[in-house]
Amino acid sequence: MTGFLADLTGSFATSAAQNPTVAVMEAAYAHAGLDVRYINCEVPPERLEDAVRGAIGMGWLGFNCSIPHKVAILDYLDAMAPSAGIIGAVNCVINRDGHLTGENTDGQGFVRSLRTVIDPSGRDMVVLGAGGAARAIAVESALAGARSITIVNRTRDRGEELAALIDKWGTYEAFRDAMTTRLKNLITDGTATNRELKSAMNLGYWG
């Protein structure tokens, strides 16, 4: 950066006003001595292509994709990191001279954080949701050695799609109309609804 021109990064989401990533990223940039700004952008699904073109045109270093763009963004990428390709969803895009590479840090971050409390290896898990974040969590947990993963989702097709994906590392269990009553070691919420709760749920684990 020279003079008053900072490098730009940001996030595309709906709703952007509820996304606290801007505070975290700008604090990290300042701590590292980087002259980079992070901008939250309100981007509805029908304007995602415009937002991507704008970021490339303005020379952004990259951007994050939050709800509801983590799967739709795949249509605009030139390449994906291997784990992101397996997950089929991206939350981080790197721009190198107009060449966009997608990465998914949701599942990796989840597993790293989880391991400070409980190792997912050999555990029975329930994942709520089947969207971008839930896909990342389920895939990375399967790769980390979870014994079983039960997907609970509102729509059958999307839930079965995710179950079939993680079946590569385990045994597929047939669809059930109700949530399983079998005791699980760990429940994780990968849905959008948890962002709107007035107070957090206290979910424990059993070992």
Q: What is each PLM-predicted segment?
A:
Residues 164-177, 181:
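Short acidic low-complexity segments
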